[in-house]
Amino acid sequence: MSAPASTTQATGSTTSTTTKTAGATPATASGLFTIPDGDFFSTARAIVASNAVATNEDLSKIEAIWKDMKVPTDTMAQAAWDLVRHCADVGSSAQTEMIDTGPYSNGISRARLAAAIKEVCTLRQFCMKYAPVVWNWMLTNNSPPANWQAQGFKPEHKFAAFDFFNGVTNPAAIMPKEGLIRPPSEAEMNAAQTAAFVKITKARAQSNDFASLDAAVTRGRITGTTTAEAVVTLPPP
């Protein structure tokens, strides 16, 4: 709310001076000074976007590249879903190596499909776009991510064991027509966040910030932080 203008008058003077507070709305509000009313809030439509999720423009560009690669148009969506489902098993980082060829891409390997995606956006952003689709797919077939146990997930949290899990509830992602079969539980969300935190901690332990490779500086260590130094207190399971 803008503060009201203040009026001051010098002693012995009949002239008053009105001082307007910076940011006060002009008497005639138009353009960028227009004041919204209730009708705007009840009728306006917000276009949801997230920098963690591939945009519709990104998908259009990827679609064009895939067409040039001879991915069949009538199974292109299924090829995308298959790739993202595969990433739920193996990961969606830039370093992840895709395995084999899916059944919907006309013999084009998942690695080539992923390489085309990376020309437009990150693989994880692409996977985030289809996270709700993969979530429903896994639940329908009772088929959790392949590496859930290796990542330290409990059996009751195993369906959350993929690194783009946050996309399941992101409003910028593509939602199946029937919606989510079930929303992620609070325990699953906590497990996914904990797993992400552990990965970051381990990655930090494997990196170094040495300015010199002289042994007097590195003391013969490859990494800058020992595993013990990288250990932090994690939230309870």
Curated annotation (Swiss-Prot):
The residues forming a coiled coil are: none
Subcellular locations according to the entry: Virion
The entry's keywords: Capsid protein, Helical capsid protein, Ribonucleoprotein, Virion
Q: Which GO terms describe its cellular component?
A: helical viral capsid; ribonucleoprotein complex
GO MF terms here are: structural molecule activity
Q: Where are the residues of the annotated region Disordered?
A: 1-24
Q: Does the keyword Ribonucleoprotein apply?
A: yes
- The main location is virion
Q: Does the keyword DNA-binding apply?
A: no
Q: Which family is it part of?
A: Belongs to the potexvirus capsid protein family.
Q: What does this protein do?
A: Required for genome encapsidation. Forms ribonucleoprotein complexes along with TGB1 helicase and viral RNA.
Name of the protein this chain belongs to: Coat protein
